[in-house]
Amino acid sequence: MATSKVTYLGDLRTSSIHLASGSEIISDAPIDNNGKGEAFSPTDTVANALASCMFTVMGIKAQDLNVDFSNSTAEVTKIMGTEPRRITEI
């Protein structure tokens, strides 16, 4: 069964719908790659997904240990390479 439906909206923007909940993520190409930069870029979501995944695993362990992990934060920095354009560091 599919998890999401991604639709290209034009102008280097996509809409991703989570099929189980209906929640939506909009992505937009960054200004330095011909986009408007008005939303997370696809590579931003990759970097943020890594932090979210780490926090989810840490939250599971915190629950097991009866430790309050709520309100923990992370700042995510993504470094892009060129030729080809790619994530080189998170």
What do these predicted ranges mean?
Residues M1-N48, T56-I90:
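Extended beta-strand/beta-hairpin segments
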